[in-house]
Amino acid sequence: VKKAIGLAMLLWVVGAVPQANAQPAKSGVERLYILNCGEGVAGDISRWSPGVNEGKSMDFVDNCYLIKHAQGWLLWDTGIPDAVAAMPNGLAPADPKAVTWRRPKTLAAQLDQLGVKPSDIKAIAVSHTHPDHIGNVELFPAAMLYVQKAEYDWPGVNNAPRFKPEHPVTKLEGDRDVFGDGSVTILSTPGHTPGHQSLLVKLPKTGAVVLSGDAVHFKDNWDNRRAPSINADKEQTLASMQKLADTLTKEKAQLWINHDKAQRDGLKLSPEFYD
């Protein structure tokens, strides 16, 4: 009996001591690349700022963000469809006030320049399901898609699903720490669409950055807390802007506004990166 008790104690002690070959989960963001996922001109920017700048055109940009984490690649938003690159006059909207989009560089070509194959990317997340953000989701048919359930369930044109039913998906209901180490957090920011989301990324040298998605479209709207006319819920939009403002303060973070050309002109684009 004494031998049995002694053996049990020995096994308990050995089990309580971390083993030398036990590998902790890898953590931390290593790099963030800003990819050119579209450029265009809005016919009338009052579409995004009701009652302000009526009749004025404005240059827009569209960004995707490739995040290299210790556990693998994450792509945030997929931009205008790569097929638009072959359209000499760009993709013209039905509404002349909206954006005529061009695709100077395909997403596939920019990934190739970095030596990244679409199959290397195991996770993608989209801010929302407007076409300028989900245009290339099916370049990554096996990647886990992170999207809010409210967005996934939101009917598309003619009640069509917004994603292929066979695409692997994680339907979120609120914020999500993607890698479990606090370095990449999806923030639920509904309003522009029912399940809109933004992304908080913590970089070792650059510090914290919030990727807005379309919670805000350009700096003037952010400064004046304006909700666009193309919007699901104004009160939710304003509440989400406040959530982002609180996050910026708490994390001492920068706000990178997806469609703001003036801001993007001052940022490094791929193949340069932030770390």
Predicted regions and their residues:
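Short Gly/Pro-enriched turn/cap motifs at secondary-structure boundaries
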Residues: 54-58, 187-192
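Bacterial N-terminal signal peptides
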Residues: 6-16
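Active-site metal-binding loops of divalent metal-dependent hydrolases
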Residues: 37-38, 78-81, 129, 150-151, ...
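Metallo-beta-lactamase
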Residues: 18-132, 144-188, 206-213, 233-254
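Cap/insert and terminal regions of metallo-dependent hydrolase folds
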Residues: 82, 95-109, 200, 205-275
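Positively charged n-region of N-terminal signal peptides that target proteins for export
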Residues: 1-4
